């Protein structure tokens, strides 16, 4: 009997390697591995999938698509879940789901699978995205279904000749892409315990960072970062370069206890050196290029966008509407921002734009002052008219009583 095809989102780790063997009982498994900037040797991962039992192993380089279509809107919104988490893993999941569906269609597969556990956010993100893109596809979650302990999973791997990763004894659960690195589990599960240095990989300890500050100038065109110190880069490459530059100064460490979608609190340690610099630089440029009403309203939608992405609703109609508003706000976000990097800090020290709304002649207190001071009197009277009327009415009522 011919087996039906299944496309598995494959990482090369123990869970998805065991999943290939487990799923192969009922399906012809096609392993799909995507490069979103995690820095792995994907050729090794491709061969490992075939060794374990996949009938085909596909590797896709999606770094540019990830940067331009998923990271960029989050950057332009200044999106942070609960004001802290810059959506590192949450941004890559809808793209991975899109590619799962695309390959499933190309291969004539009837099902897709992922390696998420039953208590994380990613299972929701994958499955809701697949349902939005093609609800006819079956989604299988082997790790959630088999309910093995780690010891039982290792025993199964050994019995079925599945290679055991050399980093299996690491206490951490790590996910990484262009936008940063997420780390949880092990000693990090105690929110009182300070993260040890081995919990970090992209950043040096701030106290060990250089004693000499470094300044970088980020160039933007219509809200898109396009250059570092005058050198132009595609967005994915620009983020990668900034990860190296800012990481060397200990910039971008975040220690956060967040409220997961599934109802639990989770302590996470994030590293996002490039993201930290870009988010600060972009926000600084908007202070001189957005009008007051847009600048005050945009953070409301930024919070909504962050929660929408975090909750796995990238492919929901709301996201399309939020992006439409965002596009309208970015046309004038063009200019340069200077950022100083020093011992864990990224400090904006200057911003300039050819379309800046900051008028020094209106702002100055020198003799160059062009502000119409006489106009202030009438403005104040009208601005306070409602409150002064209210006060007058209630003062009269008090007299009557």
From Swiss-Prot:
Pfam families: Arginosuc_syn_C (PF20979), Arginosuc_synth (PF00764). ATP binds at residues 9-17, 115. L-aspartate binds at residues 117, 121-122. CDD domains: ASS. This is Argininosuccinate synthase. Belongs to the argininosuccinate synthase family. Type 1 subfamily. Keywords: Amino-acid biosynthesis, Arginine biosynthesis, ATP-binding, Cytoplasm, Ligase, Nucleotide-binding. PROSITE patterns: ARGININOSUCCIN_SYN_1, ARGININOSUCCIN_SYN_2. GO terms for biological process: argininosuccinate metabolic process; L-arginine biosynthetic process; urea cycle. Homotetramer. It is an enzyme of class 6 (ligase). Its EC number is 6.3.4.5. InterPro entries: Arginosuc_syn_C, Arginosuc_syn_N, Arginosuc_synth, Arginosuc_synth_CS, Arginosuc_synth_type_1_subfam, AS_cat/multimer_dom_body, Rossmann-like_a/b/a_fold. It comes from Exiguobacterium sibiricum (strain DSM 17290 / CCUG 55495 / CIP 109462 / JCM 13490 / 255-15). The gene is argG. Signal peptide: none annotated.
């Amino acid at each position: 009997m011919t087996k039906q095809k299944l496309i598995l989102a494959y990482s090369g780790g123990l869970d998805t390697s065991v999943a290939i063997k487990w799923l192969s009982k009922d399906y012809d498994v096609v392993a799909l591995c995507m490069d979103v900037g995690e820095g792995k040797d994907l050729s090794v991962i491709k061969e490992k999938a075939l060794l374990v039992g996949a009938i085909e192993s596909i590797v896709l380089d999606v770094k540019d698509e990830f940067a331009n279509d998923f990271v960029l809107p989050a950057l332009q919104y200044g999106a942070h879940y609960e004001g802290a988490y810059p959506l590192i893993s949450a941004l890559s999941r809808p793209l991975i789901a899109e590619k799962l569906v695309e390959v499933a269609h190309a291969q004539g597969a009837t099902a897709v699978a992922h390696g998420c556990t039953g208590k994380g956010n990613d299972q929701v993100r994958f499955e809701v995205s697949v349902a939005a893109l093609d609800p006819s596809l079956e989604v299988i979650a082997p790790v959630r279904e088999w309910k093995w302990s780690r010891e039982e999973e290792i025993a199964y791997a050994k019995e079925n000749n599945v290679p055991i990763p050399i980093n299996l004894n690491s206490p951490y659960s790590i996910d990484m892409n262009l936008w940063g690195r997420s780390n949880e589990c092990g000693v990090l599960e105690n929110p009182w315990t300070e993260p040890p240095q081995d919990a970090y990989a992209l950043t040096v300890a701030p106290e060990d960072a250089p004693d000499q500050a470094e300044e970088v100038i980020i160039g933007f065109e219509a809200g898109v970062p396009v250059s570092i110190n005058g050198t132009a880069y595609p967005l994915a490459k620009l983020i990668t370069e900034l990860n190296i530059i800012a990481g060397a100064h200990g910039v971008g460490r975040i220690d956060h206890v967040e409220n997961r979608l599934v109802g639990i609190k989770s302590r996470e340690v994030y590293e996002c050196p490039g993201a930290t610099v870009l988010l600060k630089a972009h926000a600084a440029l908007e202070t001189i290029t957005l009008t007051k009403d847009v600048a005050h309203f945009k953070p409301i939608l930024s919070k909504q966008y962050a929660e929408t992405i975090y909750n796995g609703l990238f492919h929901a109609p709301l996201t399309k509407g939020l992006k439409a508003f965002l596009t309208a706000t970015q046309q004038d976000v063009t200019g340069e921002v200077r950022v100083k990097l020093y011992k864990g800090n990224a400090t904006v020290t200057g911003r300039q734009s050819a379309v800046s709304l900051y008028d020094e002649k209106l702002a100055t207190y020198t003799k160059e002052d062009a502000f119409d001071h006489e106009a202030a009197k009438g403005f104040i009277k009208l601005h306070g008219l409602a409150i002064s009327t209210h006060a007058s009415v209630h003062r009269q009522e008090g007299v009557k009583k």
